[in-house]
Regions:
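Subset of outer-membrane beta-barrel
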Residues: 29-283
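Bacterial Sec-dependent N-terminal signal peptides
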Residues: 1-38, 258
Length: 283
């Protein structure tokens, strides 16, 4: 009986340690996806609007650690709409990013609601060539189930006692404003302008919001350098390469990826494209 109680206490204490690491130590790493290129606004708000057509809606979902009682779930949805401004080839993209994350025994939840705007200045009348300046900012809410938090203060010397106070003073939820800014350049390449390249630089969390349930830890700013190259192999087939270098002290991450894409049906009337790709990276 005593041995079982000790094991139970150890497990609860281990959960608390993991929770504290999530709240305080791993603050330097933002949420991100292996297929990072499917969440462009998380890379750089100035990458909004870099697509064919007027509207783009993207969704990404990640589910980790399914073997545990409370798996880690992360989802992202971004929507963009672009329209011309002025008399030239300039245009504006407006939209937003919604990011949701849920993790751990204490059901730690994070919700980002981030509207964005991106202005694209045309640099040429002979080809597609734009310099873009984007801004994204909104609110982030973080919360947890306070009743699930357990600490060593609830160990009475023999076993875990949930009726004892946990000795912690933090609240179960808080919100903060988060802001990002970025620039990008994109242009067509080749004798027939059949290829496409872009690169950009973004500065995230430049307002350094407080990012802790204790209200005493500033969110570390993050730099992201991005690049991409689209090569058309023929009228219906193309390859796209993406790369990011992320620096958020003390972490640095380099990710690269690519997709092979093929339009289905008639090359001029097709609205369906099949993609296959991979994403290696290093931290």
């Amino acid at each position: 009986m005593i041995k079982r109680a000790i094991i139970s206490t150890y497990r609860r204490f281990l959960h608390f340690v993991i929770f504290m690491m999530m709240c305080n130590v791993v603050i330097g790493q933002d949420l991100h996806f292996s297929q990072f290129y499917e969440a462009p606004l998380l890379r750089n708000p100035a990458l909004a609007g870099l697509y064919e057509g007027d509207v783009r809606i993207q969704g990404v979902y990640r589910n980790q650690w399914n073997s545990v009682a409370f798996p880690y779930q992360t989802g992202s949805i971004n929507a963009e709409y672009k329209f011309p401004v002025g008399k030239g080839e300039d245009f504006l993209t407006v939209g937003g990013q919604v990011l949701y994350d849920k993790a751990g025994t204490v059901q730690l939840q994070t919700v980002h609601m981030l509207p964005m705007v991106n202005f694209h200045k045309s640099l040429s009348t002979n080809k597609v060539s734009y310099l873009s300046l984007g801004f994204m900012g909104g609110m982030v809410n973080r919360r947890l189930d306070r009743s699930r938090v357990t600490t060593n203060s609830q160990y009475d010397g023999f076993y875990f006692n949930g009726s004892l106070p946990d000795g912690e003073t933090f609240t179960g939820a808080y919100s903060y404003a988060d802001m990002s800014v970025g620039m990008s350049f994109n242009t067509t390449l080749g004798s027939n302008d059949q290829h496409y390249v872009f690169w950009g630089l973004a500065y995230h969390h430049f307002n350094k919001p407080m990012h802790s349930f204790y209200g005493n830890i500033a969110h570390l700013p993050k730099w992201v350098a991005s690049g991409g190259l689209k090569l058309n192999l023929d009228d219906v087939t193309y390859i796209t390469f993406h790369g990011d270098i992320t620096d958020q002290k003390p972490f640095r991450e380099i990710m690269g990826g690519g997709t092979f894409s093929k339009r289905l049906g008639d090359e001029y009337a097709s609205t369906t494209t099949v993609h296959a790709g991979c994403t290696p990276g290093t931290t």
